[in-house]
Amino acid sequence: MVSVSGIRKVQRAEGPATVLAIGTANPPNCIDQSTYADYYFRVTNSEHMTDLKKKFQRICERTQIKNRHMYLTEEILKENPNMCAYKAPSLDAREDMMIREVPRVGKEAATKAIKEWGQPMSKITHLIFCTTSGVALPGVDYELIVLLGLDPCVKRYMMYHQGCFAGGTVLRLAKDLAENNKDARVLIVCSENTAVTFRGPSETDMDSLVGQALFADGAAAIIIGSDPVPEVEKPIFELVSTDQKLVPGSHGAIGGLLREVGLTFYLNKSVPDIISQNINDALNKAFDPLGISDYNSIFWIAHPGGRAILDQVEQKVNLKPEKMKATRDVLSNYGNMSSACVFFIMDLMRKRSLEEGLKTTGEGLDWGVLFGFGPGLTIETVVLRSVAI
């Protein structure tokens, strides 16, 4: 008679979860940050607010963003004038866009990841879909299964409204699924669209104005699995450990509410300070078991919530400027794409490491960290191990 422990052993993978493929995608509409203030105040019929426009221009300049991708074009906004007001009911129009566009761009990213993976789609056993954009029943995870033609028996997990920390959350969930289900192959898709948050300016809401200068659209797809098939699957990173922390006393620092005007949000000025004050605790908890205390000796994939956050974390940990280069490059070229951002950084890092002839996917280093920061205030920490190139 087979023992319960024997059955459980057979059901589980032997090795750690690994990243097997990465794909990214953006809407074709690319905006120039240097001229966005003019565009934004024109399309929202707010050019009479000259002082606020000047303030918004300064905010745009301080972001250190050069370009962002957005589904919303001037034509779409003209067809939906309520989306250009600060406080006009427009949720129906926004939701209709989300249900269509979030899975569409997600499919584009997923198709790229599946192609790199090199295995038939029939081997995908689980789907994790994450978005802060819109809500539907059945979810956009269902829509993606239809668009891709995935097996209807794929076990799916729909994560709505997690926010900017969720890149770490989906990895934490995927690691558990891959390591506890033999031969599991988990497709993660994070797809974000700012049509849910776009609105006109208000002199009494600087949080919204900062968001209009910072957030962008994008999707990333990742395939996670343990025990890679030799000569077929090529690991990119190993997922060593994961952790989540709700920072004490940080209630009200970051959050959002779904209203008739769309998704409204608030961003406390203390957010960069809260994150930087808690970053060393997160690092020590993650790396003390590995005997690592020099955080310049690891590679960094940090969610680019904004320039001030990166600056304060860099200063607090005494990081060399090059440690955040991949993160800052993604922020500069794409803006803040919420949950998808960390995977754009991961993709850039592994490609750049190969191009520069480094020995591992993690800038030539063995160990690294992935951080997600978001509503709560929540910090997600993922310890990564690179793979030899």
Curated annotation (Swiss-Prot):
It is an enzyme of class 2 (transferase). The keyword Cytoplasm applies. Keywords: Acyltransferase, Cytoplasm, Stress response, Transferase. Pathway: Phytoalexin biosynthesis; 3,4',5-trihydroxystilbene biosynthesis; 3,4',5-trihydroxystilbene from trans-4-coumarate: step 2/2. InterPro entries: Chalcone/stilbene_synt_C (IPR012328), Chalcone/stilbene_synt_N (IPR001099), Chalcone/stilbene_synthase_AS (IPR018088), Polyketide_synthase_type-III (IPR011141), Thiolase-like (IPR016039). One of its GO terms (molecular function) is trihydroxystilbene synthase activity. Its main location: cytoplasm. The keyword Acyltransferase applies. It is found in: Cytoplasm. Induction: By stress. Experimentally by elicitor of P.megasperma, yeast extract and dilution of cell cultures. CDD domains: CHS_like. The active site is at 164. It catalyses: 4-coumaroyl-CoA + 3 malonyl-CoA + 3 H(+) = trans-resveratrol + 4 CO2 + 4 CoA. Its EC number is 2.3.1.95. Belongs to the thiolase-like superfamily. Chalcone/stilbene synthases family. Homodimer. This is Stilbene synthase 3. It comes from Arachis hypogaea (Peanut).
